[in-house]
Amino acid sequence: MNWHLYIPYKNTPRPADGHYLGQIASVYLNDDQTLIKRTYNLNGVTVNDSPSEYSAEFIKERWAREYRWINEFNGEFFMPELIDANYDEGWTVQKYYGPDLLIQGTSQIPNVEDQVLDIYKFLKEKEVYKKNGSLSNMTHDNGRLIAFDYKWTVPRDTPGDHKELEERSIDLWLSKISLDLVPKLKALL
């Protein structure tokens, strides 16, 4: 199978909110754009067309989180279909549903607010903070919201400022779906 580097973002100049997209994983699409492969390695080119500025140790730690959560949440109503993953080599292959919501918007998702709330209710039940609810980490499958990218996800009892980072994710990114979501999501924290 042939894989083609996927670079949907050029983060030049610095984005207005100061948050560069795609700083860790290299992303590839297969020939017919039905599968997406993400690799976690120090020498890759990220979706913003630059190498990661993170250390090998940092990338490995984020990969371990990604691997854990895509396997624990595999098959859930909001997860992309997992085709294959290799922990030792640091890659996943999932079904590709099309561009992320930052690119395609949310107009094709009839009840997007309810679906976001359902996902975050699930995450609360599982006692985790996702911490990156960016539209660039969501897509849809014929109106069904798909959330991906779990490398920042941590159990809620992990020491650190994770709750504050989840609030920031709500304020910066999930609020772009609807400002009405903000208090509802924060109530789940």
Regions found by a protein language model. Name each.
Residues N11-Y67:
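ATP-binding glycine-rich loop module of kinase domains
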Residues Y28-D32, K95-Y96, D141:
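Active-site beta-strand termini and strand-to-loop segments that position acidic
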Residues L35-I36, G90-T92, R144-L145:
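Hydrophobic residues embedded in beta-strands of well-ordered beta-sheets
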Residues F58-Q115:
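Conserved structural core of kinase catalytic domains
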Residues N74, L123-K124:
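Protein kinase-like catalytic domain
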Residues N111-V112, E125-K131, H140-L189:
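C-lobe/activation-segment region of protein kinase-like
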Residues Q115-F122:
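Conserved hydrophobic core/spine positions of the Hanks-type protein kinase catalytic domain
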Residues S136-N137:
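Conserved protein-kinase catalytic-loop position immediately C-terminal to the HRD catalytic Asp
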